[in-house]
Regions:
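Generic multipass alpha-helical transmembrane bundles of integral membrane proteins
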Residues: 1-59
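C-terminal transmembrane-bundle signature of multipass membrane proteins
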Residues: 41-149
Length: 151
């Protein structure tokens, strides 16, 4: 929990490469599985929390994601926006776009996984018990942005 007035939920170990990997995977999933809603359920939701993480407050992407997802869920369950012409977006249903986005997501996520395994082996840290990326400047910046210090 942040040591600031906001008392934000902090996950300092959730760094930019993990966030980008998740965003790519989630967008690929939305575009492949719910194409008609991918613009809203995927792109808009992901951009909003990722923008907030990179440009408003660092280290609390998970909280940004939970809040934007909750607001979108309440809105989409209360308003049938898909039936309104002004919200209508026709998906391309383009197999090339699906494949490229999915391949990019798979490659980026595999790279993050390999990097995480390398860090685990090199530092002998158990990711279930200790934070993994304490050696990176981005980790320290996430802590500092929330009034916290490394232990």
């Amino acid at each position: 929990v942040a040591n600031t007035k906001s008392r934000d939920m902090v996950w300092a170990d959730q760094l930019w490469f993990w966030i980008v990997a998740y965003d790519l995977w989630n967008m690929a999933y939305c575009y492949n599985c719910i194409s008609t809603r991918a613009m809203y359920a995927g792109f808009a939701l992901l951009v909003s929390c990722t923008f907030a993480e990179f440009f408003i407050k660092r280290g609390i992407w998970l909280q940004h994601r939970a809040q934007t997802l909750a607001l979108f869920g309440m809105f989409s369950l209360a308003v049938d926006y898909q039936a309104m012409p002004m919200f209508s977006i026709t998906a391309t249903y383009n197999p090339t776009a699906w494949t490229v986005l999915s391949a990019l997501a798979l490659i980026f996520n595999a790279a993050v996984f390999v990097y995480e395994v390398c860090v685990i082996v090199k530092t002998k840290r158990n990711p279930l018990k200790k934070e993994m990326f304490t050696h990176l400047p981005a980790y320290r910046k996430n802590l500092e942005a929330n009034g916290l210090r490394a232990e």
